[in-house]
Amino acid sequence: MKDKMQNQNFMHTLNSEQKKAALHTEGPLLLLAGAGTGKTKVLTSRIANIIQQNLALPHNILAVTFTNKAAKEMSERVHNLINCYGVNIGTFHSMAAKILRDQIENLNLGLNNKFTIISHDDQLTLVKDIVKLKKDIDTKKYTPKLIHIIISRWKDQGLLPSKLSASDTNLPLQRVAKLIYEEYQKNLLISNVLDFGDLLLYNNELFIKNPEILKYYQEKYRYILIDEYQDTNIAQYLWARMLASLYRNICCVGDDDQSIYGWRGAEVGNILRFEKDFAGATIIKLEQNYRSTLPILAAASNVINNNKNRHSKTLWTDSASGEKIKIISCLSDKEEARYIACEIDKLVREERYHAGNIAILVRAGFQTRSFEEAFINSAMPYKIIGGLRFYERMEIRDVLAYIRISLNQNDNLALERIINVPKRAIGAASLNKIRSYALERNISNFVAIKEILETGIFKAKSYESLKDLLTKIDNWYEKFITDTPINVVKTILDDSGYLSMLQEEKTEEAFGRIENINEMLRAIAEFNDIHDFIEHSSLVMENEVLETNYGGSVTIMTLHAAKGLEFDVVFLPGWEEGVFPSQRSLDEDGEKGLEEERRIAYVGITRAKKDLYITHAESRKIFYEIVHSCPSRFINEIPDEITIRTSSMKKYNSFYKF
């Protein structure tokens, strides 16, 4: 009786369409959830309802998100609703990694379940190393970075080297990338490591080649829920389809109008063809917005309605009031920045808004410089989101490499990162000898060093350093078996000389690096198993998002980074043809590119809760050139009756004296 009342209580908080989605329990469901319509609330209510109706046990439900933060929030909400843990909630990568840990040997690739997941930077390093060995490749024309991007896109599409078709390798660059891709995969397998693309790629291979394993997971995950479906790539889409093909109890939640990650592999077609993929699917639209005012929603709807390839939906709100959209014309980008800085200063001084609830969302990174100057001049606290994230910092990656090589001695990338840090008299020549020896014999660098040490070809100093390092790595491996992760990592820091190296440097930078390592140790202390920490750090590096603790500073960030966030006041600068929509997107992708740009505009508009400013400049300095431009076509798509259009100089004359 208590459970039933609790069920009724949380259902009572849902609107009619939300309730319809939460009560839907059989067959495929596409939940089209517009910005600010409470999709997480619906997802968690649906999970709670399935459990309370005894349709599935918690561990038979799989909920997939794109970030660790979203997964954690979803898990906490389910627990708060029905006091239940045990639902499988995680990111695509974490769920795929979990399956591979249990099943990797069934792929017969020589991998074992102790594999490690390498970071984006380590992936690029490996590509660079392979390209260096290919003397006939023009690295100026075919850069390692570009080759790596192509390899990553192929993985997003679920394509191993053997599955690339003639159309995939039409261009000379693609043919070069295919050669590197083949070597890249071989190197990963030898090192017993995977990159992020491999997690879904090999999951799909596992399911295709082993129908009985697929059947096991289909039985295990009888109810599947996928958040942000519009952001899925082809590999993720295939994975979800295979898992759901038996019971067809799949609920995909998304908004095609917010699909803005095409440049990194997201395929908006996945959500647009849901009804074809799952015949007889139920479609429910969430259109009641709980975030923004009526004028903001009207602006967003009028802009996005110009896209042809979309599911029709219109956001609405019970709130009839709200400030009109301010559209401001400025003479230059400098004046635009000065106007925005002055307007924010006015809003804060008059105590209408707190600085931490104000954001400037730009289309491209080059736009931020003028705002930095304007805020420095006005003494307005601000932060630009986009610096190095914690797990990407040099010292953190060094310590992670030490841990990885201690756990997996075949991890070539980890070994090469730390082999001469601190200095051990092991230069490029010695490293090349090791690499060549290993490649010729199809063995890892660690094994190669052991064999080479027997030959005596290294100089005495290098010989002693390498012998000492290998002995320590063996000792650390043994210590991880018997001691706690935190104690072993402290030992590694001391034994390796890494901590001493930083302490002896005695600079502010070195002090900051030591502080970061101490913070890392605090994170490690929360884990009983070092493998769990390594996996956690790898997945965080891939999925880390901005924490919503803005303090007292104005936030400056890109529109892409702002997705999923909200602010009381939003400024959208640079709404000019060529800047937004981006000329590059128009040139490269035509109408498809324009529609993605319009979706980015829609995302920007719907970040605002109460007040929205859109600015454009008649001239802008772009890469040392003054460019004259016209207002963005997106501005013309916003109805006049919900806007106040003026120039920055008029505003200056009204509010400020210069």
From Swiss-Prot:
PROSITE patterns according to UniProt: UVRD_HELICASE_ATP_BIND (PS51198), UVRD_HELICASE_CTER (PS51217)
Any one GO cellular component localisation term in the record: DNA helicase complex
Keywords associated with the record: ATP-binding, DNA damage, DNA repair, DNA replication, DNA-binding, Helicase, Hydrolase, Isomerase, Nucleotide-binding
GO MF annotation terms: 3'-5' DNA helicase activity; ATP binding; ATP hydrolysis activity; DNA binding
Transmembrane segments: none
Enzyme class: isomerase
Record SUPFAM superfamilies: P-loop containing nucleoside triphosphate hydrolases (SSF52540)
Residue ranges of every copy of the UvrD-like helicase ATP-binding domain listed in the record: 12-293
Domain of life assignment: Bacteria
Keyword ATP-binding among record annotations: yes
Keyword DNA-binding on entry: yes
EC number of this enzyme: 5.6.2.4
Domain UvrD-like helicase C-terminal: start-end pairs: 294-564
Binding site for ATP: 36-41, 291
Catalytic activity: Couples ATP hydrolysis with the unwinding of duplex DNA by translocating in the 3'-5' direction; ATP + H2O = ADP + phosphate + H(+)
Record-linked Gene3D superfamilies: 1.10.10.160, P-loop containing nucleotide triphosphate hydrolases, PCRA, domain 4
Listed GO biological process terms: DNA replication; recombinational repair
Pfam families named in the record: UvrD-helicase, UvrD_C
InterPro entries found in the cross-reference section: ATP-dep_DNA_helicase_PcrA, DExx_box_DNA_helicase_dom_sf, DNA_helicase_UvrD-like_C, DNA_helicase_UvrD/REP, P-loop_NTPase, UvrD-like_ATP-bd
General function of this protein: Has both ATPase and helicase activities. Unwinds DNA duplexes with 3' to 5' polarity with respect to the bound strand and initiates unwinding most effectively when a single-stranded region is present. Involved in the post-incision events of nucleotide excision repair and methyl-directed mismatch repair.
Family: Belongs to the helicase family. UvrD subfamily.
Stated name of the protein: DNA helicase II
The species this protein was found in: Rickettsia typhi (strain ATCC VR-144 / Wilmington)
